[in-house]
From Swiss-Prot:
One of its GO terms (cellular component) is cytoplasm. This is Aspartate 1-decarboxylase. It catalyses: L-aspartate + H(+) = beta-alanine + CO2. GO terms for molecular function: aspartate 1-decarboxylase activity; pyridoxal phosphate binding. Keywords: Decarboxylase, Lyase, Pantothenate biosynthesis, Pyridoxal phosphate. Its EC number is 4.1.1.11. Pathway: Cofactor biosynthesis; (R)-pantothenate biosynthesis; beta-alanine from L-aspartate: step 1/1. Catalyzes the pyridoxal-dependent decarboxylation of aspartate to produce beta-alanine. Has weak activity with glutamate. GO terms for biological process: pantothenate biosynthetic process. Pfam families: Pyridoxal_deC.
Length: 547
């Protein structure tokens, strides 16, 4: 530990030391490394503060905008991080943190991550990555085979082909979706005659040449917001993302899709892509992928499947049928940092046809030369870390049967929780789980009885107070720090398709137990009873209706 009367200096000798000499085992950082390797969960429990602290208070620790003019000892700075940053982080790996698409991670990833950081490979080019490039190509090939199931000869021919790629690693699903639609756009508005293609001449010239007024991307109203980002970046415009109605199971409505396509074509707007969602963010629902593929084929447009969440289900022989038709996609997005259990920052887009990515191929004499196997020729992002190493390791250590166990238990746990909710007099299941995601809300039995006989006007009033009560329960539960569920807004049939605030849970963490789920409901019930505004108002309205 550094004494108070010693200060660090910015000499070149001290700078060389931080590049070449590790921290001593008894230093703050050395002790932390030991704690992390011995008991990660205990370290997180001890250092992350459970109680909620207002963001305005946390911001007070991060207000100095001036660049430090004097260095700080590593141990001293580590203590600072523990006090200000680690303590106010979110314990996303906690078994009771079931509100978002996060989970505990396998222990072996921590030391492997240190190796990855130490190697500091840059996957843009073979000269800065060497073996990491064929490894990444292999991982993309493994996922391609999981989705599309081609024969050995296909992968022997294409997986390491210099001028082709089976997909791209990305920082996440957003870049993966943008990449898929970038390929779709460049293929649709390809070179023809004197027109040199959209990549060379731009969108305005492309629309003029192809004599259309715009492009359209069709996706369900439950589609991810990244698709609007993609439309914005690609020059299509956010209005070019056409939201298609969903049915009562939150799956895209095919009749409305046909209507929206006809309306777009009547305005001389060209269908660019149909996007099927395999695991919506809000409800975990899966669109009818096979039927969407048929529509896309008929319209001659790109069929993309956003399986950022649900794609890992393909690992399960028991449940992969839920993604029936995904093999008909032109491209598929999968996030490894979701149900493939690697750290944040690993998404992928996989293309069925190895030729497709040639439409976005780029070259630069100093780095991305023609004929090279550099991955950067086909990726939106340039410099990238070797995250494929961590996914490759998970594939080998966990294996497909291991992933199947993880996927199966998560889905079965969701069904257990759904059944548990339905057994309660004062809770109501809103959406049945297709994968391991479901929504529900707290509705006291007397409120249910009142809703059965209430007028439409009275129902609207009850809905408003139920929404306020749901927000109160969710916020209080988060601030208390024992457990966490998120909330979202849906338009369920049971509530006359009115915007309705509901609890949302994601059960991907293998450490989440049935007892934890039982306690979540018990805690929510206790919090509801402590409400001093919403619940009394509800009881007053309900009392007037029932009496």
């Amino acid at each position: 530990m550094v004494t108070d009367n010693k200060t660090a200096d910015a000499s070149f000798e001290s700078l060389l030391r931080i590049f070449t000499v590790p921290e001593a085992p008894d230093s703050t950082l050395g002790i932390i490394e030991k704690e992390l390797s011995q008991n990660l969960n205990q370290f997180l429990r001890e250092h992350i503060v459970a109680e909620e602290k207002p963001l305005t208070e946390i911001e007070k620790d991060f207000t100095d905008s001036s660049m430090p003019e004097s260095p700080t000892y590593v141990s001293e700075h580590t203590e600072h991080l523990l006090d200000t940053l680690v303590s106010q982080s979110v314990h996303t790996s906690a078994p009771s943190f079931i509100g978002h698409m996060t989970s505990a991670l396998p222990y072996f990833l921590m030391p492997l991550s240190k190796i990855m950081i130490a190697l500091n490979q840059n996957l843009v080019k073979i000269e800065t990555s060497k073996a990491f490039t064929p490894l990444e190509r292999q991982v993309l090939g493994m996922l391609h085979r999981l989705i599309f199931g081609q024969k050995d000869s296909f992968y022997q021919h294409w997986m390491h082909s210099a001028d082709h790629s089976l997909g791209a690693f990305c920082s996440g699903g957003t870049i993966a979706n943008i990449t898929a639609l970038w390929v779709a756009r460049n293929r649709l508005l390809k070179p023809e005659g004197d027109f040199e293609g959209i990549a060379k001449q731009g969108l305005f010239a492309a629309l003029m040449h192809y004599k259309c007024n715009g492009l359209a991307i069709f996706v369900s109203e439950r589609g991810h917001y990244s698709l609007k980002k993609a439309a914005d970046v690609l020059g299509i415009g956010q209005d070019g993302v056409i939201a298609v109605k969903t049915d009562n199971n939150n799956r895209v409505c095919l009749d409305d899709l046909e209507l929206k396509i006809a309306q777009a074509k009547a305005k001389n707007i060209k269908p660019l892509a149909i996007v099927g969602v395999a695991g919506t963010t809000e409800t975990g629902s899966i669109d009818p992928l096979r039927e969407l593929a048929n529509v896309a084929q008929r319209e001659g447009c790109h069929f993309h499947v956003d399986a950022a969440w649900g794609g890992a289900t393909l690992m399960s022989n028991t449940y992969r049928h839920l993604l029936d038709g995904i093999d008909l996609a032109d491209s598929v997005t999968i996030d490894a940092h979701k149900q493939l259990y690697v750290p944040m920052g690993a998404g992928m887009v996989i293309f069925k046809d190895p030729e497709l990515m040639s439409s976005i191929q780029h070259h630069a004499e100093y780095i991305l030369r023609k004929g090279s196997k550099d991955l950067g020729r086909h990726t939106l992002e340039g410099s990238r870390s070797g995250m494929a190493m961590l996914l490759y390791s998970c594939f080998n250590v966990i294996s497909r049967p291991g992933y199947e166990l993880l996927i199966n238990q998560s889905i079965e746990k969701a069904h257990y929780f759904a059944d548990l909710i339905q057994q309660q007099d004062d809770f109501e299941l809103i959406t049945e789980p297709e994968l391991c995601l479901l929504t529900y809300r707290y509705v006291p039995s007397n409120v249910k009885a009142a809703l059965a006989i209430a007028t439409d006007e009275q129902k609207i009033e009850i809905y408003e107070h139920l929404d306020n009560l749901t927000k109160y329960i969710q916020k209080t539960q988060r601030e208390t720090g024992k457990s966490f569920v998120s909330r979202t807004r849906l338009t369920p049939e049971a509530y006359q398709h009115q915007p309705t605030i509901v609890f949302r849970v994601v059960l991907a963490n293998p450490l989440t137990t049935k007892e934890i789920l039982q306690n979540v409901l018990i805690e929510q019930r206790e919090i509801a009873s402590s409400s001093e505004i919403s619940l009394p108002l509800l009881n007053q309205i309900v009392g007037n209706i029932l009496h």
